[in-house]
């Protein structure tokens, strides 16, 4: 009986050692998975930041283009109004000159 008890103790010890070894391997694998997940997350964050940067740049460019178009439109309208005012002023000046001539 002592031989089988000794064998049982050896088997238990071997099983315990194997379990400890498997636990350590599982811990190592978990650390590896964690490190890989962190690296993947860093890549995803960098990609998201790049996408956001591109989106913001596109939005800024679009806003600048719209502002430029609006400024050009305002400038055209202002120039048109200036021309109209000049035309009206010329007509009034000519009318005044004509009335002065008619008075003479």
From Swiss-Prot:
Primary localization class, coarse: membrane
Source organism superkingdom: Archaea
InterPro entries per UniProt: A-ATP_synth_H_N, ATPase_A1A0-cplx_hsu
GO CC terms, sorted: plasma membrane
Assigned keywords, A-Z: ATP synthesis, Cell membrane, Coiled coil, Hydrogen ion transport, Ion transport, Membrane, Transport
Coiled-coil ranges per UniProt: 54-104
Topology within the bilayer: Peripheral membrane protein
Temperature impact on function: Optimum temperature is 80 degrees Celsius.
Pfam families, per the entry: A-ATP_synth_H_N
Location of the protein in the cell: Cell membrane
pH dependence: Optimum pH is 6.0 for ATP hydrolysis.
Gene3D superfamilies listed in its UniProt record: 1.20.5.2950
This protein's domain notes: Purified ATP synthase is 25.9 nm long. The hydrophilic A1 domain is 9.4 X 11.5 nm, the central stalk is 8.0 X 3.9 nm and the membrane-bound A0 domain is 6.4 X 10.6 nm; the domains are connected by two stalks. ATP is synthesized or hydrolyzed by the A1 domain while ion translocation occurs via the A0 domain.
Homology family: Belongs to the archaeal-ATPase H subunit family.
Function per UniProt: Component of the A-type ATP synthase that produces ATP from ADP in the presence of a proton gradient across the membrane.
NCBIfam families in UniProt: AhaH
Subunit details: Forms a boomerang-shaped homodimer with arms about 12.0 and 6.8 nm in length with 89% helical content. The N-terminus contacts subunit E. The C-terminus contacts subunit A. The A-type ATPase is composed of subunits A(3), B(3), C, D, E(1 or 2), F, H(2), I and K(x).
Protein name: A-type ATP synthase subunit H
